Amino acid sequence: MTEISEYSAKLPAPVEQFILHWGDMGSHWGVNRSVAQIHALLYLSARPLTADDIAETLGMARSNVSNSIKELQAWNLIRRVPILGDRRDHFEAETDIWEVAARIAAGRKEREIDPAVDALRACVSDAADDPTISPVASKRLKEMLAFTELVDRFYMQMLNVPRPRLVALIKLGEKIVSFLPTGKTK
């Protein structure tokens, strides 16, 4: 468990479970556990929260909350909202789960896929001019580049698909998969 266990009386059990689970999942995805827990709390909150509210509810250091808020804002997953009569910053999460997924995917593409494509292109180009590169290594670099570019193109195409059509496409994919034979094929 994490920090919030001693503060659990302040949160309903399902909310606490979700926050803890989201924090664990975040750490598996390469996101700081505190960042993921704060996102989960704001996602489920019925009202905008201050950094002090977050720190108290989750039992986190205020500095940790501040840094985590900056990271969530950089991912465009939360926003600062003004509250009339209160000078403190309040924060709320994007609650449209499709939008959350799109923003996370965009952030991961920018931070991971784009640099990978650039690096692989450079490696393939450099390998073409290097007589010390084995044909096996050259072939595998080209295959990895082709795969990464394919994933990148697919992502870019999916950005332009309206949500209702995307939902229909996902459901269609489920139906198609049910007709395919099971087991791995090469």
Label the predicted regions.
Residues 1-28:
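N-terminal leader segment of winged-helix/HTH proteins
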Residues 76:
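Glycine-centered, phosphate/nucleic-acid-interacting loop/turn motifs that mediate DNA/RNA or nucleotide
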Residues 29-34, 50, 83-104:
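Short, cationic-aromatic polyanion-contact patches
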Residues 53-56, 72:
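A short acidic, leucine-rich amphipathic alpha-helix
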Residues 128-186:
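C-terminal regulatory/oligomerization modules of transcriptional regulators
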Residues 98-143:
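Amphipathic alpha-helical dimerization/coiled-coil segments
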